[in-house]
Amino acid sequence: MKRTFFVLLLLAAGTALRAQTLGGEYRLSRVFPVEGRQGIAADSNYYYVSGSTVLYKYDKQGRLVARNGQPFEGLPLAANHIGDIDVWNGEIYAGIETFEDGKGENIQVAVYDADDLTWKRSIDWEPSSGQVEVCGLAVDRDRNMVWMADWVDGRYLYGYALATGKYVRKVHLRPVPQWQQG
């Protein structure tokens, strides 16, 4: 019994020591070119890329498998720009707005089907939140929320409930980042 305990203890200690060194060195294994330069998201099978006006889907070998060249079609508010994206539970969440002269209007989180990149619904922006632009977006899987960042005023992150689409709150960032993207 003591011998088994000692072997298990050594194994656990060795695993703990090994775990501390994991991730210490990264090597680029390959590169493949993609269209788009606004945002990228990945699930276990695909990469999703946003251009300013197009959504793309690539397999893990870098082959283009889907493209939506009309991502603003059907949106409840006029838009001309896709920014950052995230993917969760078979849906792509995209920060979308009408962006002109450094100002965003009609901010929304457009939700697309990850299979065929078609628009499903939008989460409306809450103007009283103080947000004036959307530069970054992330799905908070633990809290079932989507968070947006603002390039013009980077002091806050703005959170919306995924279940209801309603604005929940903003979080003050300290120290304040400036001109963050994606």
Where are these regions (language model features)?
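Beta-propeller domains
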Residues: 48-72
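Short loop/turn segments immediately following the C-termini of beta-strands
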Residues: 52, 97-99, 149-153
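Blade-loop segments of beta-propeller domains
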Residues: 64-99
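Repeated scaffold domains used in trafficking and secretory/extracellular systems
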Residues: 34-41, 76-84, 129-139, 178-182
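Structural motif
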Residues: 55-56, 101-110, 154-159
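Short coil/turn segments that connect the beta-strands within blades of beta-propeller domains
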Residues: 44-45, 89-90, 142-144
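Beta-strand-rich domains and repeat architectures in extracellular enzymes and scaffolds
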Residues: 27-53
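Surface-exposed loop and turn segments in beta-propeller and other repeat-based domains
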Residues: 26-27, 68-78, 119-132, 169-182
